[in-house]
Amino acid sequence: MKNRLFRLSILLFAVAMLFLPLSGLAAQTQLQAKNVIILIGDGMGPSQFGAAWIYSNRVLNKDLRMSELMNKGRTAYLVNDTADAIVTESAAAAGQIATGQRMTARALSMAADGKTPVKTIMEMVKEKKLATGLVTTSGITDATPAAFAAHVPHRSDESSVADQELKFGVDVLMGGRKQFFLPESAGGKRKDGRNLLEEAQKAGYTVAGTAEELKAAPAGKILGLFNMGNMSYEIDRAATTEPSLAEMADKALQILSKSKNGFFVMIEGGRIDHAAHRNDAPAVIRDVLAFDEAVGVAMNFVKKNPATLLIVTADHETAGMSLIGHSKESKEYVGMDLKAIEKSKVSFELMAGKWGKKPTPEKIKEIVKQSMDIDLTDNEAQTVADDTIKKLDPANFNYDYLHSLAFVLRPYLRVGWGSQTHTASPLYLFGSGPGSQKIHGLMHNTEIFTVMKAALRLK
């Protein structure tokens, strides 16, 4: 009898031990989060992710960190329609993530009346004395970062956004578009004559303008502005001048983790979107890979700081990217030309800058050969030249002048595009850490706010 009871107790103990890992995972995801890190790949739909995954695995011989997060964490599919549109843009999409309410196009965290501010997750954590950060490779006054810390009726009012971000007291601000912090007399775009860099320094910010200055910056509030316009595409970036997104993310986490109350930070791969607007597949892939490195920095931080909710997603997909099969010479379904992608040295935008406003077909052929090792035909080069002359309008921001270049390069790169603007494609949402158990199934991007708010137990 005693032997039977002993064997039964051993069996029950063994069964209990089997469930400990599961209960541990449940406990981890149900704990209150001290920190929240959200990374947003602007314009990164499933095809942009897929192209980078293929390139990384087949050319670089390594997997994406996002793949690891997908496999070990939580995964959902995300939709993002807004109050007034099926297809969103970045201001509305970021505002929905930041506030949990459906937004209207181009307004930054404002109610549908265009006058009433809607409180953001960053404003809520600020009230709880958490540190805050915004990091992007686009402009720090661009729509995605702006939606978390500013309220304006139209996203184009970037001078007001810059002012509001500093008044908010965001502890870490890193990105481009320094022009909105400087008066016109100093080469900026501010019409009020104010120099916000000087004002930031007086308010206790360290101002950094290069990768080296960022590296040397002490712990404390920092305003890193690394380009008068957007930061460079990763494919064009000069490492000695501009930091990578991963380097900015690492510095941001070093600073923000000093807060005893925890922190909230949004880190954006902002130029994925711009490259996709231009149908520039090599630049898209390089910027997704740079974004993935920043995801890796965040994942490494989370391993050492498990009370951190990590979220990785996108605001929308851009341009209907597709990985087509037919090659120029055959009907075989060989897929994206990885060698052609690998040989591409600069962005389409930089190439167009080299050949100027009135290029000859010969000049276009020369620069494409130098930049991509691709020999355009005379007709293809003429198509690009004609389209450039016809559509280039320096007075207006548009993508049309690169459309013909992207079109003639499609059969060489074997990457297709449905448009040069946003789409309503569903997106990926990955997560790990406290509160991430709510990430599952099909979700609307307003629910990301709910996940973050619940994880931090905000009221």
Question: Which stretches of residues belong to each language-model region?
Answer:
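Positively charged n-region of N-terminal signal peptides that target proteins for export
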Residues: 1-7
